[in-house]
Amino acid sequence: MLTKTFQSFLFAGIASGLVLSACTRSGDDEVTFDQVPPVLQEVPPAGQLPDGIIPSAYRLDLYTDPAQDEFTGAVEIDITASEPHARIWLHSIDHSILSAKAMLEDGSELTATFTRSTADGGVSRLDFATPVPQGNSTLIIEYSAPYNFGLAGLYKAEQKDRPYLATQMEPIDARRLVPSFDEPRFKTSWTLTVATPAGNQVITNGALKAQTTLDDGSIQFQFATTREIQSYLVALAVGPYDLRDGGVLPPNEIRARAVPFRGFAPAGKRDQLEEA
């Protein structure tokens, strides 16, 4: 009888030890965030881009010469990734990508490979050998692109043999100006810096902060950061525009703050702004 009792206690002790051992190991076997496979969606998204990447700010640096047929740009896009991404989908039409990378919060960089998609709407992708981690980072893309001649994106037109540039972004043509997450659900701030040959005006949404002459004689215009807006609301015009300064419109029952008022017209047509 004593032997059977001892055997029963021994069996119970072994069983309890196994249970405790399993409980102890569960912490070691817990799947960590680094072990989660990174997002790599194979099929180009139809309709909206995936929800895993959210843009929050754009800093766009352009060189535009209305006399030429193309422009160059460098854009920094601040993003937040909901989880690690080995592939990021975005919009790009007619851009030749010179370089692409992601800069992480610690200053390290991840090189990306750009692939232009055959999907409708210019849906394209950035592939990373080392995934972009969860959290905040910045996409940095250098590119060149032709001016559009069909009143879409950054288009070129001539009047009296003088070339002008202007934008028409709505509804989905900001993706012709800059690689971007070109959907109205994304509202972000935009900071533009635009260089152009002397003699041209540059007009954007932001207030002009500084104007600098570069070593090659070009003029660089630096603009204040906009409030958060959709990409189709970004506006840009470059060329020999005439300027008429209308002063500052004071606050009234409709607007709560003063608003600077200026008008631009093609060269030689400033007088037509008298009644604007």
Per-range role (PLM):
Residues D94-Q159, D216-G217:
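A surface-exposed beta-strand-loop module
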Residues V75-I79, F128, G135-F149, W190-A198, ...:
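Short, hydrophobic/aromatic-enriched beta-strand segments in well-ordered soluble domains
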Residues E83, S92-I97, Y147, K187, ...:
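Short proline/glycine-enriched turn/loop motifs at strand-loop junctions of beta-rich domains
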Residues L2-L10:
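Bacterial N-terminal signal peptides that target proteins for export
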Residues C23-T72, Q159, P163, P184:
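N-terminal, polar/Ser/Thr-rich
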Residues G73, E170-I172, S180-A276:
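Hydrophobic helix-coil surface modules that form long, contiguous segments used
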Residues F71-D94:
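Ligand-binding face of N-terminal immunoglobulin V-set domains in extracellular IgSF glycoproteins
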Residues F9-S21:
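Bacterial N-terminal signal peptides
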